[in-house]
Amino acid sequence: MSSNKASFFTRLRRLCRLAVWLFKTGKNLRGIDGGCPESRNRAVIELGRGVLAALDIGLEVGRPAPEHPNGVLVAANHVSWLDIFAMSAVYPSSFIAKQEIKSWPVLGKMGQNAGTVFINRNSRRDIEPINRAVCETLQRGQNVSFFPEARTSSGLGLLPFKAALFQSAIDAGAKVLAVALRYYDETGKRTARPSYADVGLPTCLWRIVSMKKLTIRVDFVCVADAAESEDRYALKDKIEESIRAVVADDADIAV
């Protein structure tokens, strides 16, 4: 009977390639610090693709991103630390991320150079200044991505969205792009193994490199005009419902 896990050699090779990628990236972080938007976007795309390639992770784009100007607030469901790299590989942007990531080796510095806004999820006092910062970033024509669930899920369903950070799109008069992320194993079935909702980063990474094959599917679901929403709650509901429908689409065949 064949194992449904990658061989130990494959796991070790993937970890070694990730270590090499981290080392090389750590020496060239200035590529995403400053410069023109085009060069910064290219650097962000390369970072996203580099991590996925090192770990042998496939990337599929289901519904493509619609044509729209820059300065878009991107909202996605949150499953794994891989979410950021998958999204960056196809749609470069800054991110709103939890404060703990700022201290992560290499990845924290990458986030800072890419313009990531780090937030304390336990402090409501952070919301107003964060919304101002995101609004200003959107008005400069830079895309900003965030995860309105505010924490990771199994990826087979959706946690309730938080409405607070949608206010930045309303204040900026920006568009909001809904993105659905789904993870599949080597059999083509949905999987929750890449999630770190209930495990730490080392365990999550080991689960990922242990999979025979992992594919991330990115669907750009819809675009909402924040100016047409009654308030941030109505805007949140529209985006949440659109993502929930896609995430639930084939979750019944998950393993």
From Swiss-Prot:
Its EC number is 2.3.1.51. Transmembrane segments: none annotated. GO terms for biological process: CDP-diacylglycerol biosynthetic process; phosphatidic acid biosynthetic process. SUPFAM superfamilies: Glycerol-3-phosphate (1)-acyltransferase. A motif (HXXXXD motif) lies at residues 78-83. It is a peripheral membrane protein. The keyword Lipid metabolism applies. Pathway: Phospholipid metabolism; CDP-diacylglycerol biosynthesis; CDP-diacylglycerol from sn-glycerol 3-phosphate: step 2/3. It comes from the Bacteria. GO terms for molecular function: 1-acylglycerol-3-phosphate O-acyltransferase activity. It holds the Pfam family Acyltransferase. The keyword Membrane applies. GO terms for cellular component: plasma membrane. It is found in: Cell inner membrane. InterPro entries: AGP_acyltrans, Plipid/glycerol_acylTrfase. Keywords: Acyltransferase, Cell inner membrane, Cell membrane, Lipid biosynthesis, Lipid metabolism, Membrane, Phospholipid biosynthesis, Phospholipid metabolism, Transferase. It catalyses: a 1-acyl-sn-glycero-3-phosphate + an acyl-CoA = a 1,2-diacyl-sn-glycero-3-phosphate + CoA. NCBIfam families: AGP_acyltrn. PANTHER family: 1-ACYL-SN-GLYCEROL-3-PHOSPHATE ACYLTRANSFERASE. Converts lysophosphatidic acid (LPA) into phosphatidic acid by incorporating acyl moiety at the 2 position. The HXXXXD motif is essential for acyltransferase activity and may constitute the binding site for the phosphate moiety of the glycerol-3-phosphate. Belongs to the 1-acyl-sn-glycerol-3-phosphate acyltransferase family. This is 1-acyl-sn-glycerol-3-phosphate acyltransferase. It comes from Neisseria meningitidis serogroup B (strain ATCC BAA-335 / MC58). The lineage of its organism: Bacteria, Pseudomonadati, Pseudomonadota, Betaproteobacteria, Neisseriales.
